[in-house]
Amino acid sequence: RSCIDTIPKSRCTAFQCKHSMKYRLSFCRKTCGTC
């Protein structure tokens, strides 16, 4: 899978992942460009 930076790293928090993005934390980290 390619990693796409969909949200700013500053907003990549556990809360964002669990409540806004509906993804697991590991996937949220990938979408924040930390792959």
Curated annotation (Swiss-Prot):
Keywords: Antibiotic, Antimicrobial, Disulfide bond, Ion channel impairing toxin, Nematocyst, Neurotoxin, Pharmaceutical, Potassium channel impairing toxin, Secreted, Toxin, Voltage-gated potassium channel impairing toxin
Feature type site, description Key residue for binding both Kv1.2/KCNA2 and Kv1.3/KCNA3 (occludes the channel pore like a cork in a bottle): 22
GO biological process per UniProt: defense response to bacterium
Keyword Disulfide bond: yes
Site label Important residue for binding Kv1.3/KCNA3, positions: 7, 9, 11, 20-21, 23, 27
Effect of residue 11 to Q: 7.5- to 42-fold decrease in potency of inhibition of Kv1.3/KCNA3
Chain segments annotated as transmembrane: none
One GO cellular component, as annotated: extracellular region
Cysteines paired by S-S bonds: 3-35, 12-28, 17-32
Residues annotated as domain ShKT: 3-35
Effect of mutating residue 16 to K: 6.6-fold increase in selectivity for Kv1.3/KCNA3 over Kv1.1/KCNA1, which is marked by a 2.6-fold and 117-fold decrease in potency of inhibition of Kv1.3/KCNA3 and Kv1.1/KCNA1, respectively
GO-annotated molecular function: potassium channel regulator activity; toxin activity
Effect of residue 9 to Q: 10-fold decrease in potency of inhibition of Kv1.3/KCNA3
Superkingdom as given in the UniProt entry: Eukaryota
Cellular localisation: Secreted; Nematocyst
Physiological role: Peptide with both antimicrobial and neurotoxin activities. Inhibits voltage-dependent potassium channels. Potently blocks Kv1.1/KCNA1 (IC(50)=6.7-87 pM) and Kv1.3/KCNA3 (IC(50)=10-250 pM). Less potently blocks Kv1.4/KCNA4 (IC(50)=0.31 nM), and Kv1.6/KCNA6 (IC(50)=0.16 nM). Shows moderate activity on Kv1.2/KCNA2 (IC(50)=9 nM), Kv1.7/KCNA7 (IC(50)=11.5 nM), and KCa3.1/KCNN4 (Kd=0.03-30 nM). Blocks Kv channels by binding to a shallow vestibule at the outer entrance to the ion conduction pathway and occluding the entrance to the pore.
Miscellaneous comment: Negative results: does not show or very weak activity on Kv1.5/KCNA5, Kv3.1/KCNC1, and Kv3.4/KCNC4 (IC(50)>100 nM).
Family to which the UniProt record says this protein belongs: Belongs to the sea anemone type 1 potassium channel toxin family. Type 1a subfamily.
Protein name, per record: Kappa-stichotoxin-She3a
Source organism of the structure: Stichodactyla helianthus (Sun anemone)
